[in-house]
Each structure stands twice: as structure tokens, then as C-alpha cells.
Regions:
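Short, aromatic/His-centered strand-loop micro-motif at the edge of beta-sheets
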Residues: 115-141
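Short strand-turn-strand beta-turns centered on an Asx-Gly dipeptide
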Residues: 154-158
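Sec-dependent bacterial lipoprotein signal peptides
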Residues: 1-25
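Flexible glycan-contacting loops in extracellular carbohydrate-active proteins
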Residues: 163-195
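Secretory/extracellular carbohydrate-interaction modules
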Residues: 32-114
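Bacterial Sec-dependent N-terminal signal peptides
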Residues: 2, 21-42
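Short tryptophan-centered beta-strand motifs in secreted/extracellular beta-sheet-rich domains
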Residues: 138-146, 151-153
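Surface-exposed coil/turn segments at beta-strand junctions on protein surfaces, enriched
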Residues: 51-53, 133-137, 168-170, 184
Length: 195
């Protein structure tokens, strides 16, 4: 029901159209930061301090390096890694109520799956019905479109999903890249991102 209401809103279509225009017209890579996760760690560094701010629409650009692909974690290979997102600042912790763009390796070498991933009252809720695939070293843009404390997610202009959580996100903090799931990074990984 929320999706039907959101898709009737003019601002959703304006943001989607702006995103499509930006994506089609982008000829150069934006200024990015290199994030590195060392083998045996979870956190990609540098790890920015998540200062609180009022909920708003956020845009970003990322590129997953071929070093991010792996297939040696057994059943944990299917866990979702976090790329970027927002969380409710009032909850203090990032994994209680959050709205995230997540990634994992595809079975095909050097291909990655992207999806919307939520934490709702501490429960993990990946939206696996809408998977977007990118190749290693292929840049992509993403948009966290916000209205009245609710978010929807687009990647390269493709709608990936909307917020299922009924708690409004009024004051938020940013979530940055994180490996896992249960396991830590099996080897050094790097990605580029502007968020």
C-alpha cells in the first residue's frame, strides 16, 4: 500500500527522472573515497563518524573493486554486506532500524548483487525480490529518496524498494561500508564511494 501511495507522489517521479538524467549524462566519475577492509575485519576504513542530521534525500556513487568478489565462505557467502544507508538516530545503534543498500557476490565471478536491506526492530529484512547486478569496476549511482521520514531506494534509476518499517526516520545518521554477516572479510577488499 505504501508503494502505491509513494508512486502517486510527484516528487518520487521527479527524483527518478533526475536520477535517470544524471545517470545518462554522467561522463566522469565523481570524487570518491577509497574504502579498504582488511582480511579478518568487518569495517571498511575510513569509517566516518555518523553525525546526526534531519532526514533528507541522499545520493551516492560507488564502484566495487574485483577484490570484493569471493566464494569461499560457505553458506555465509549469501550474507549481505552493507554499502551505504541511514539509520534512526534515536535508536543509537545502526542495526535496529535502518535502510541500507547492500551487496554480495553473485555466483558468476566478478559480478555483484545489490538490494535494499532493512533492519526493523533489530530483525534483518533483505528485499531480495528486487536484485540489481553490477560488474566489478562498474560504477553505479544510488538515491535514498525521502518523504516525511520514509525512504525508497533507486540504483542507476531502477526502483529497488521502499521502506517497510512503519517507524519514521526523522533524525538520521549515515551507515558506511561494512563486511558481513557473520564472517569477517576473507581477504583485503577495496571499493570507491561518494556518499
Amino acid at each position: 500500500m505504501l508503494q502505491k501511495n509513494l508512486l502517486k507522489e510527484w516528487w518520487v517521479w521527479v527524483i527518478a527522472l533526475m536520477g535517470l538524467i544524471l545517470w545518462l549524462s554522467s561522463c566522469t566519475k565523481p570524487e570518491t573515497t577509497l574504502y579498504v577492509c582488511k582480511a579478518g575485519q568487518h569495517d571498511f576504513k575510513p569509517s566516518p563518524v555518523p553525525f546526526p542530521f534531519a532526514a533528507k534525500t541522499l545520493t551516492g556513487w560507488a564502484l566495487l573493486d574485483s577484490s570484493c568478489w569471493y566464494n569461499d565462505l560457505g553458506e555465509d557467502t549469501q550474507d549481505w554486506n552493507k554499502l551505504a544507508g541511514v539509520y534512526r538516530w534515536a535508536d543509537v545503534v545502526k542495526n535496529k532500524n535502518s535502510f541500507i543498500l547492500a551487496w554480495r557476490p553473485d555466483p558468476m565471478r566478478n559480478v555483484f548483487q545489490l538490494c535494499l536491506y532493512e533492519n526493523i526492530d533489530g530483525a534483518n529484512r533483505p528485499h531480495e525480490s528486487a536484485i540489481y547486478k553490477v560488474n566489478a569496476n562498474q560504477g553505479f549511482s544510488f538515491w535514498f529518496a525521502e518523504s516525511n521520514g520514509e525512504y525508497i531506494l533507486f540504483v542507476d534509476g531502477t526502483f529497488l524498494g521502499e521502506q517497510d518499517n512503519d517507524k519514521p526516520f526523522k533524525t538520521i545518521g549515515k551507515i558506511s561500508a561494512w563486511f558481513g554477516g557473520n564472517q569477517t572479510a576473507p581477504h583485503d577488499m577495496s571499493l570507491q564511494m561518494d556518499f
